[in-house]
C-alpha cells in the first residue's frame, strides 16, 4: 500500500515518501526519481526493520524515538508515550479514557482548548508540557529521518495514510503535526483506498468487473471496505485505451477492536491470576511498572500464538520480587 500512496503524486523534488502511521507503529516508503537509485522501496530503521515503534520518550532531559524509546517502555512506562495518534483532536475526557483503558500512566492535564496535554520529564530542568500534535510531530520527524537516510537526499513531500474513521478534528491535528515536523503533506488518504490502489494498479479490468473486500485489523481498530473495480474506454495520444478505476461502495469499522484489545483481555486474565497467586488483597493493576512488564510479555505470547496452538507465559519479578508463571 505504501508504494501506491507514494505513486499518487509527481513531487517537485527528486523524491516523495509515504507514511503508514498507526497507533502502535509506522512504516515508511520512498519513491526516488534520482537516476541510479531504486525507484520504490521501504525504508528500514536503525534495527534494520521495516516497521518502527511510533513512540516518543523523555528521560533525564533526553528525547528518544522509535526503537530507542521502545527499550525503555517496561522500565519507565510513564515516560514512553504511545497511542499519540489516537489522542489527536480528542476532548480531554475522551483522550484520558483511551489512556486508562490501555493502562498508560501518563501525567496529563487539560489545555485551554479542552484537549489533552502531556507532562514530560524535563530532567534537571522543569517538566515540559506537550500536546498530542507536538508528540506526533516528533514521530513524523523520525519518519522523515528514516526516509532521508534511505534516499540519501532531503525529502519534505509526503502522503500519509489514515484510518477511515478518523474525523475532521483528528485529520486537522495530524496536518498540524506534519507542519510542525516540516512536512509538506500532498494528501491524507484513507488506508483502504491505498490498499485498493495497490491491488488494482497492475490488473486488467477491461473484460471483467470485480468486487473485493479489504479487511484490516490493526493495533487498536478493525475495518472492512467493499470496493468495485472496473474499466472505461479513454484516449491517450489519440489512441483508445482501457483505464482502470475503482469505487469504494461501503466501509465499516470498529475503532475499539484491535490487536491491543486482544492483549488487554489476556492482561486482565493474567492480572487476576497473579493477584490470586500473591493474595493479601494486592492488585497488580495499581502498579504501572508491573503492568508494563505484563503487557510486554503478553504481546510476545500473542505473537507466538500466531503460529502455535499453545505458548507459555512467565514474568520474572512482576511485582515486589514475585515471579509470575
Task: Describe the function of each predicted region.
Residues 8-99, 107-111, 124-129, 133, ...:
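Oxyanion-binding/catalytic loops of NTP- or PPi-dependent enzymes
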Residues 115-122:
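Glycine-rich active-site/cofactor-binding loop and its immediate structural neighborhood
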Amino acid at each position: 500500500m505504501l508504494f501506491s500512496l507514494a505513486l499518487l503524486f509527481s513531487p517537485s523534488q527528486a523524491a516523495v515518501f509515504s507514511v503508514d502511521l498507526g497507533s502502535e507503529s509506522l512504516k515508511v516508503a520512498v519513491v526516488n526519481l534520482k537516476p541510479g537509485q531504486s525507484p520504490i522501496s521501504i525504508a528500514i530503521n536503525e534495527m534494520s526493520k521495516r516497521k518502527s515503534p511510533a513512540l516518543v520518550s523523555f528521560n533525564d532531559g533526553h528525547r528518544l524515538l522509535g526503537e530507542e524509546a521502545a527499550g525503555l517502555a517496561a522500565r519507565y512506562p510513564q515516560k514512553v508515550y504511545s497511542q499519540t495518534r489516537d489522542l489527536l483532536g480528542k476532548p480531554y475526557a475522551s483522550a484520558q479514557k483511551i489512556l486508562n483503558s490501555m493502562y498508560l500512566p501518563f501525567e496529563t492535564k487539560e489545555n485551554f482548548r479542552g484537549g489533552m496535554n502531556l507532562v514530560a520529564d524535563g530532567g534537571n530542568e522543569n517538566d515540559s508540557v506537550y500536546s498530542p500534535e507536538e508528540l506526533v510531530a516528533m514521530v513524523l520527524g523520525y519518519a522523515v529521518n528514516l526516509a532521508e537516510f534511505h534516499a540519501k537526499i532531503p525529502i519534505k513531500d509526503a502522503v500519509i495514510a489514515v484510518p477511515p474513521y478518523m474525523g475532521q478534528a483528528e485529520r486537522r491535528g495530524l496536518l498540524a503535526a506534519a507542519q510542525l515536523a516540516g512536512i509538506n503533506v500532498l494528501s491524507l488518504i484513507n488506508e483502504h483506498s491505498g490498499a485498493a490502489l495497490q491491488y488494482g494498479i497492475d490488473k486488467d479490468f477491461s473484460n471483467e468487473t470485480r468486487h473485493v473486500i479489504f479487511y484490516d485489523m490493526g493495533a487498536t481498530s478493525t475495518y472492512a471496505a467493499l470496493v468495485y473495480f472496473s474499466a472505461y474506454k479513454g484516449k491517450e495520444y489519440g489512441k483508445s485505451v482501457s483505464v482502470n478505476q475503482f469505487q469504494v461502495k461501503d466501509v465499516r469499522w470498529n475503532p475499539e477492536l484491535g490487536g491491543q484489545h486482544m492483549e488487554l483481555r489476556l492482561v486482565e486474565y493474567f492480572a487476576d491470576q497473579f493477584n490470586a497467586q500473591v493474595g493479601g488483597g494486592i492488585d497488580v493493576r495499581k502498579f504501572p511498572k508491573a503492568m508494563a512488564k505484563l503487557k510486554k510479555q503478553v504481546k510476545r505470547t500473542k505473537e507466538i500464538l500466531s503460529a502455535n496452538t499453545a505458548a507459555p507465559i512467565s514474568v520474572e519479578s512482576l511485582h515486589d520480587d514475585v515471579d509470575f508463571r
